[in-house]
Amino acid sequence: AAIGLYQQDGAGNLARAETVFGLKYFLSSQSAILWMSMLFFMSTAFYWLGMFARGEGHTMSLIGSRLAWVAVGMALIGTLVRWYESYLIGPDIGHIPVSNLYEVFVMFCWMTAAFYLYYEQQYGTRALGGFVMLVVSAAVGFLLWYTVVREAHEIQPLVPALKSWWMKLHVPANFIGYGTFALAAMVAFAYLIKQQASETRWYKLAPLWLLGVVLCFEPIVFRQGAAETGGGYWMVYFGISALIVAGILMGRKRIAERLPSFEILDDVMYKSIAVGFAFFTIATVLGALWAAEAWG
């Protein structure tokens, strides 16, 4: 439907993204990705409301789950439309949207959420949604910062080294690994929260608080020098992350009651790590083959 809206006189016209209502506000790649961002933030909020709500917790977490599904859908729409838009700019410019941090962070967000939603269905619990969506929201925060500071949403031609069909295999395989590792890390954090639910000594909880803040800063590792180029933004980001993690620790007893058993948490972690290692191994092999073809 989105691609059809670009058609004018039998040919695609990129300028229609600014004039056609459906494209401008909903289905152009940039609009769809902004909707994805908002929906992931809302999903995170509803999952946590469901965690602490007494009477309507199930309803709140269900809304969080539905919002996450819609966000994944908007991310896929944004990705596919962006791919089409790149060809509208020029046949020689068109490429799969996995060539810069803006594009791969969109992929990271929806892949991480999609894997979590799969496990949510498999194990019949939504209690982990708040934890996993925190790292997705952290990635969305980085994505929005990168969009504003670097105008990364603009489609750029590929550098010669990236003009290879290997990129279509290597990058997605890598980010399946990143997504499942991030999922496993947040489930592990939930495991520790459940394990330390009855702990009252602050010096025992401080390392757990620090770990939670570090996990929120995971997106920075993808961009060298990110902290130096947006100091004010990252200070606010740090403050919000620190408060959120502190709030989780303060409510750890309530959270521990809602979390699934240690056996289920272990199982989700192990399966996520297994998937991550498998795809990371594939990505490493593909990367080596790509490098051999590109540089010999």
Language-model features: locations:
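Hydrophobic cores of alpha-helical transmembrane segments in multi-pass integral membrane proteins
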Residues: 1-19, 26-155, 162, 169-256, ...
